[in-house]
Amino acid sequence: MLIQLIEGVYRLLWGDLLTLHLGNVTLSLSFMVILLLTAGGFFTLRTRLLPVRLFRDMLAAVCEKNDKGSGLSSFQTLVVSTATRVGMGNLVGVVAAVSVGGAGAVFWMWVTALLGASTSFVESTLAQKYKQPDHLYGGWRGGPAYYLHTLAERKRGRKLRCSVAACLFAVSGLICWCGISQVVSNSVSEAFQNAFSIPPLVTTLVLTALAAVIVLRKEATVKSLDVIVPIMAGCYFVMTLWIILTHLPQLPGVFVRIFSEALGLRQAVGGGFGAVVMNGIKRGLFSNEAGSGSAPCAAAAAECDDPVKMGLVQALGVLIDTIVICSCTAFVMLLAPESVTSGLQGMNLLQAAMQYHLGSFGVVFIAVTLALFSFSTFIGILYYARCNVAYLFGDSWFWQTAYKVLALVMLVVGGMQAYTVVWDLGDVGIGLMTIFNMLALYPLSGEALTALREYEAKKKLK
């Protein structure tokens, strides 16, 4: 019954809503694809192509130090958001996109990132502007639930104990992160079964036990991610870059395949043109999280002298995630012969490609890399979750711990569930989060744009 409900909501959000007949090409788009493309295009135009104009400012904002000691630094917030993107998004998300949508899905992931960077800027700037003191953990907390609450108070003209839209966003976020917890264990157990022939149940239980030791500690923080994430991402980037450089003669053919399938000029392995577009954008959202309201939960925790700088940091995170690391994963798979990867999906597909490039070491490398990424992902999503738990239940150690236990249970469940069911729950949660987040982004976006103009005016005076 529960699985049927999840699949029903999934079809409502991600199933075909609009079908366009363009000559010999049929393009079927879902509600979420239309929503994200529209929002991304709108905010990209309103910010006047921010990812291009202010790229140097993004790099400068990441390097700023936190001298006050409270809250996170700009770099730490980038690390937290990268922890949830790199691994689940860059490995599992890209694999899922190519498995179902073919090579053309990669192009639409790039489009999602370029448009999503501006969306991420707006939501993260607002999160920083409307952050609140975190009396339980110290520092700051915030995110869409908090600026949705502010918007509701303005419309009502009075103080509110809670906002319906804010509560719905918070609940959707908790559902989504439970789904991601399942994706973590499902992917790791599958990878370890392929690499070491370890039964999924054993891998899942060990992963859950190790995760419990980390996340159930009262003083567990994101400081461990400061070292883990940069090293993991760096090693993965270097390894995949080496594979790409050793296959340079094949690279033009890969680009031809990506663009021809993306634009409907060649039939994709995973289905028609609409399937290519939808899966690329859907997995692009799962990877870079732009517009979903996840990253603002980290952005709000930063100690920052200008909300715009935090918006720039998170916009950069979207570009790093999808344009750089996701592309590396995609090229590794697409540089392998189709005869090697044909008929495979999930981590089986990526491991087969890595085995082709690096032999048995490639299978082990991906399994170990994914396991390490999964720890950082799990810590990252629980960091996101705690501000939403706090909005729903206040400053309560009981409810914070209860959600951590629930997430650990989802790790166990995910290791035993079917691949598609696990993804559907995550897609339902992230879809609902995006809808509720957009309810605030459009009416409040003017404040982020005003802050951007003031930031640029200050730059001219210096």
Cite the ranges covered by each PLM segment.
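N-terminal alpha-helical transmembrane segments of multi-pass membrane transport
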Residues: 1-88, 98-105, 116, 440-462
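Helix-loop-helix module between adjacent transmembrane segments
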Residues: 39-44, 82, 115-140, 149-186, ...
